[in-house]
Every structure is written in structure tokens, then in C-alpha cells.
Amino acid sequence: MYLAMPVILYRLAFRGLRNRGYFSRWLERFGWFRDPSFESSIWVHAVSVGEFNAAIPLIQELMRRHPDLPMVVTTITPTGSDRVLKQFGARVFHVYLPYDLPAAIERFFARIKPRIAVVMETEIWPNLYFACREHQIPIFIANARLSERSMRGYGPAMSLITEAVRCASLVAAQSQIDAERFLQLGAARDRVCVVGNIKFDMAVPDGLHEIAREWRQAWGALRPVWIAASTHEGEESAVLQAHARILGRFPDALMILVPRHPERFRAAISLCRSYGFRTSCRSEDQIAALDSQCFVVDTMGELLKFYMCADACFVGGSLDRIGGHNVLEPAALCKPILIGPYTFNFAEITDTLVGENAAIRVANGAELGTQVIRVLSDGKRALAMGRAALAVVERERGAVPRTMLAIEAILSDSPTSARH
């Protein structure tokens, strides 16, 4: 891994050029940070915003059950870091996860002294896992998922990944398909279980309906509104072409565009204007003007508010080969959902929603425009789709208590403090 140091530094610098947040707190990524002087702690790792949002109920419940143990939360991305600090502030100890370098990991462990490592979804770092095994720190992979694309991506490193996965005390998989893939990866059968997807347990924040009602009134209460959320560079042109088609049917329609990554914000605003759309943005205008045709959300942490405002919700990362993003947020808000053809990151969930007439799968931007028009034109159909989506969410709830039961079983068997 040390031979890869030039590549690591280059990637960090490259990302910093796109997102200035990567230029901050470099030392944390090498295990250098203020020693909190913990005797023991509970450590939860979530790579970025989506994984952290899923981890919130687990973190809250762990803090409630173990008030005597400090809570450590790590992320990799600056946006994930911002979300942690906004949600918990000083109630948790937050740093970036160090690079997968033995010395950096040793410094990290020496400072936080974790009693357990709760790793969200698909974060498998060989040196980190080997160090956990060496220090007798149980690894719990929560909300575990593994796509076919991820399996293929391990390639020549497969044997190393297999050895790392075997270090896990328990893999709590989202689905039977995910469980089978972890078994194929080499996880021990008695250390893999299916608990469901924690994201089904999302709680709708208080006051969300009131905020949406106020904003819709300010935008023009009767105008149709749709949202294109978590979009990527390769699909935003298709989304804007869809909106042009929608405006042909609904001249007063408003599209809310929410780029997935902050470094895309300014480019997305420019792209909307290049199509000739009257465009406003959240950071400058706060709310969409009555004559706005596009409203770009160039802030973080507000996606649920804008989902609640929409009459139809397109979830991005699915028109391009990204694999899709979280469709359960609009589903939990009783919204009709549209997705593209590439949803392999959430294959089982999206197939269920489509199969139960809660979501519509489209092939391209032209079809997206056509289907959004149909949803906006038929209030009864939109309501039925939203209710079907919510029914799927309600039926699948319960992963958080099942996950907590498994974590508590491991904690009760683990030593009071790990060996450092």
C-alpha cells in the first residue's frame, strides 16, 4: 500500500480541485488528529451522505443504550462529514477514516480504541479489517449490500478481499441476493444473515408537510412540479430535454434539479440556462420565483424537503450507468417515482416498486418526459402510485431493531476494551 502513496496523494489533490473540502483536514486521512483520550468507544463508519443517513437511527439507538461509551463516526467524503456535524455536532467524535495504510490505521485505533466497528454497506478495506482482527475488534457490516458490478470490480484483488471479509464477525445483509454474494466472496455462512434494508425504517421529519405547503404556495400553488434528484453529469442533458417536452404540455411546470455532487452545482445551473430555461437556485434565491422553469438545489441536506414538494420524482444515477440512488426516500413520502434503466445498486427494491406499480422505468430522456407528463396529467394515477410506494416501505420496515439485536449480541460478547 505504501507504494501507492503517490497515487493516493494525486487522487486527493485531484478531488480537491473539484471539491475544496478535500483540501481540509488532510492529516486525519493519515491517522493524525487530536487524541480524544477514550478508554473505549463505539465506532460507526459511513462513506458518505447516503450511508450516513441510513446509519442515523443505529447511531441514535446505540447512543441511547450506551451513554457511557463515546460514539465515533467516520466518513470519507467532505459532504458526509458536513452531514455528520450538522446532525450530531459535538455529541459524536467525528474524523475522516484514514487511508488503508497500516501505520495510519494503528494511529487511528490508538486514539479511538473501538470496542466494535459498525461498517455501513460495502466498505471493505483489507488492512483495516486485518487490523481489527489483530486487535480483536469485532466488525459488524450493517445494511450490507454487494452488487454484481462490485463483485467484478474486485478482479485481481479478490483473494485479498475474501480474506478481509472473513474477518467480519457478522454481515447483516439487506437481501438474500446480497447475502449470497457475500457468501460467494468468502464470508462464513454462520456469519451472514438477512435483516432487511435499514433505509425502509426512515422516519419522516416533523414539519416536512408544512414546509412543502409553504413553498408550493410561494412557487404558485397550482403549477405542476417535478424533481430530478441525485443527477449526474451524463444524464442532466437528458433530464433537461425531458423538461422541455413537459413544458410543451404544461407551460408553467417547474423542475427542481438536485445534482448528486456539490462540484456539479455551478455546471448544472449553467447547463439549465444554456437550454434557455429561466433558472434560479437555492443558494441565491432561496425559493423558486413564480416565473422560474428550473430551480437548482445547490445546497446539501435538503433533498427530503424538495421531494415532499414534488408531484413526481425522478431518482437519478439511473439514466447513466451509475446504478441508481435511494428510491426509498420518495417512496416513504408517498410520491410517484420514475427511474432509468440502470438501477443495479438497488435492483431488488426498484424491481419491487416497478412490479407493484409504484414506480415507472424509462429508457431515456424522451420517455422520461412522456411519463412525467402522464403522471402530472392523472392525479388519481399519481396518488395510487404514491400509496403503492408507501405500502412497500411500510411492509418492509423493521431492519433497525433486527440490526440492533445483532449488534448488541456482539457487544455483549466483546471485551470491555479492545487490545491495543
Question: Which role fits each region the language model picked out?
Answer:
Residues 1-420:
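Nucleotide-activated sugar donor-binding and catalytic core shared by glycosyltransferases
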